[in-house]
């Protein structure tokens, strides 16, 4: 079966799954924006994705296939990340500038979303850990599903 569009998300329309089993189809963060890919469902059946150009990135809970008994949905595998919580605006600027020079994709959370303080989230990298340790910057290594997939963006100077 070839899927060309995603029309439903179980978090937007929870009533869609009533009376049916929900089975997660696991995706890594790095493939969520790929239009064309093949995935294996439980039981060995393969499902092809051939999404239209400009289609939104796959989200947790997107319905891939459904029948009377079962709904197959996107389940995003958590990503190994560093949640960096600088102590003040000066330290935040230093960290953002230093890691930005490495062209690391980063995301940010407001106080109370992930931690009590505002945080910068980057994918785990042992060199970043060394940098943070060398500069006594507070961080926590954890796994989470980021709200937006991490993407390396090209750049020029």
Swiss-Prot record:
GO cellular component assignments: cytoplasm
Localisation per UniProt entry: Cytoplasm
Primary site of residence: cytoplasm
Keywords for this protein: Chaperone, Cytoplasm, Nickel, Nickel insertion
CDD domains in the cross-refs: UreE
Keyword Nucleotidyltransferase carried by entry: no
InterPro entries from the UniProt entry: UreE (IPR012406), UreE_C_dom (IPR007864), UreE_N (IPR004029), UreE_N_sf (IPR036118)
Keyword Lipoprotein: no
UniProt GO MF annotations: nickel cation binding; unfolded protein binding
Gene3D superfamilies registered for this protein in UniProt: Urease metallochaperone UreE, N-terminal domain, UreE, C-terminal domain
Any Pfam family hit: UreE_C
Family affiliation: Belongs to the UreE family.
Protein name per its UniProtKB record: Urease accessory protein UreE
Organism: Corynebacterium glutamicum (strain R)
């Amino acid at each position: 079966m070839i899927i060309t569009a995603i029309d439903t998300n179980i978090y937007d329309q929870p009533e869609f799954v009533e009376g049916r089993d929900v089975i997660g189809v696991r995706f890594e963060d790095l493939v969520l924006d790929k239009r064309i890919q093949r995935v294996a469902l439980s039981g060995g059946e393969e499902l092809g994705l051939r999404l239209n150009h400009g289609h939104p990135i796959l989200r947790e809970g997107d319905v891939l296939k459904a029948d009377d008994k079962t709904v197959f949905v996107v389940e995003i595998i958590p990503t190994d990340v560093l949640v960096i919580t600088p102590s003040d605006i000066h330290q935040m600027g230093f960290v953002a500038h230093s890691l930005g020079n490495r062209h690391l994709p980063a995301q940010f959370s407001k106080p109370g979303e992930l931690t009590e303080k505002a945080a910068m989230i980057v994918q785990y990298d042992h060199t970043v850990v060394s940098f943070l340790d060398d500069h006594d910057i507070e961080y926590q290594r954890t796994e989470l599903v980021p709200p937006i997939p991490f993407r390396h963006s090209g750049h020029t100077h």
